[in-house]
Amino acid sequence: MNNGRVKIVGPTLSRRSFFGRATAATAMAAAAGCDPLRLGLATSDGPRLRVGVLSDIHMLRQKDAMKGEIWFEKALRWYDELKADAVLLCGDIADCGLVAELEYAAEIWYKVFPGGKRSDGEPIEQLFHLGDHDFGGFAHKYPWAAKCSTDPDAVNHALVNEDIGAIWRRLFNEEWAPIQVKEVKGYKFVLAHHPRNMSKGTAIPGLAEALAAANPDPSKPFFYSMHRPVHGTLPGWSGKSLENDVNHKALAKYPNVLAFFGHAHQNCADELCLWQGEYTAVNVPSTSYCCTRGGRENSFSCANNPDKKRPQQMDRVDCMTSNQALFTTVYDDRIVIARRDVRHDASMGPDWTIPLPSPDGSCSEMERAAIALPPEFPEGAKATVSERKGKNRARQEVDQVVVTFPPAHSRDGRPRALDYEVVASAKGFKLVRRVFSTRAYWAEGEEREQSCCVFGRSELPEGKIVTFTVRPANSYGLAGAPLPPVRFP
């Protein structure tokens, strides 16, 4: 096992010396998530490296029992079937930061990979690092900590109060360091544990020096992972300034780095979970549960709600049955990332393909959005409108108007809808809402239920006919053709 010691590096390469130019076909493949093989482009002979990538498994000790093992184990067995060379786990292993929770994760790891070997006897490398939950829980008095254990002395068994080096050696048979460097089949991985005493913030102390000391080969990709993401790489946060982010500044010197971030629990069906700027980054989904972008009537939280003073009319979408993971395959000329619905053993969308050497910005939001197609409803699809008595998210009983519609799945080269724009209009009145579908975080073959958007009756004008139109939108906000309008009352 690598002990985290690294060498001093020479000068770094410029961005343009690494990135090349792409054909239009490759750019379209990157936007649509298509494998260039299908487009007849030149490819390497075979995979050089296979890595399972997952995050936020949240092993949980609750009432002296452990939870969280089902989907973690299932993801590991999928990686075993695909003959992964390594598994990268991007933090939040222990939900409440308890030693017992980390021990449980190690137990499951060795259950699937006894002696650190796959079922075919070949070795597999564990590339684990800690997140804020691992060093949080009781230590930072998070409100969810009370659920973690009935043991009043549980804080004394928290990782933050223990010798993490001794625990890491005991569980994973390797030395622990705040930033560890490993090499798998000639490819380097720089793994940054979440800082022990950081309850807020993202800065990794010593990151720039560690990246330089790792001395990555400029002619091939290398990999970096930390738990909390660079905010400007998050879906819905792409416009946030990166200029003062110390992690971003350190990574921006290496156009050949592929960074994996956890923490955000974003739906990997969202194309913006793949980001490219000065380097390339992936926001890794949670194998435990999903969160969503804000700003939708049924967003996971009220964050980014355009009108925070108004109670949302819908409960948050049920993301607790979302269990996702990724699988990364490295070739000489490309990296391919498969997106997985672990619960249903199905794809969450077309594979992402990152050409090597990567074109200048071809995987950026701007480039992919420019060539992305809008989703479309199936032919003959219709919306309906009804009235009911219900409760808004503030649990207030209100009269509501419900617009119901079918999901817009991928077809004819068009993508699955990420969300839906529902417009209520009347003379002198217009109200726009956005919603996620009921099962947006499941593989689309499992998304069979009707979805809806709920309006408060008091939000609509009295004495006027209100017309509702529904349009499906892709990850970049581009909406397709609307369903035939429906009127109320």
Which residue stretches match the model-derived regions?
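Beta-strand-rich modules
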Residues: L460-G477
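A short C-terminal boundary segment appended to hydrolase-like catalytic domains
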Residues: D45, D307-A426, K430-V435
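N-terminal export leaders
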Residues: S14-A31
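N-terminal active-site segment of His-dependent metallophosphoesterases
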Residues: L39-E103
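Extended active-site neighborhood of metal-dependent phosphoesterases/phosphodiesterases
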Residues: V99-A212, P216-D217, V246-K253, A269-D315, ...
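Active-site neighborhood of phospho(di)ester-bond hydrolases with catalytic His/Asp-centered motifs
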Residues: L54-S55, V87-D92, E125-D132, Y224-H227, ...
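N-terminal secretory signal peptides
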Residues: M1-S14
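Extracellular fibronectin type III
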Residues: G477-P489
